[in-house]
């Protein structure tokens, strides 16, 4: 709903910020709580 959120890595490391524009998916770019995803961390402006 907000356009951003956080991913909790399985390895217990710190949560990772994710913006909806980074989601590579056809159609509506959203993630559901608890959904399993794969991701690559990229540095960007804060």
Swiss-Prot record:
Which protein is depicted? Major cold shock protein
Question: Mind telling me which Gene3D superfamilies this protein's record contains?
Answer: Nucleic acid-binding proteins (2.40.50.140)
Under the heading InterPro entries, the entry gives: Cold_shock_CspA, CSD, CSD_CS, CSP_DNA-bd, NA-bd_OB-fold
Compartment annotation: Cytoplasm
Q: Is Cell cycle one of the keywords UniProt gives this record? A: no
Q: What induces it?
A: In response to low temperature.
A GO cellular component annotated for this chain's UniProt record is: cytosol
Disulphide bonds annotated for this chain are none
Residue spans making up a coiled coil are none
Q: How does it assemble?
A: Homodimer.
Q: Known SUPFAM superfamilies for this protein? A: Nucleic acid-binding proteins
Gene Ontology MF term list: DNA binding
Cite the entry's keywords alphabetically: Activator, Cytoplasm, DNA-binding, Stress response, Transcription, Transcription regulation
Instruction: State the superkingdom.
Output: Bacteria
Q: Which residues belong to any copy of the CSD domain?
A: 1-46
């Amino acid at each position: 709903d907000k356009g951003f959120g956080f991913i909790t890595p399985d390895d217990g490391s710190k949560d990772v910020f994710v913006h909806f524009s980074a989601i590579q998916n056809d159609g509506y770019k959203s993630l559901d709580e608890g959904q399993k995803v794969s991701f690559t961390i990229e540095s960007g402006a804060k």
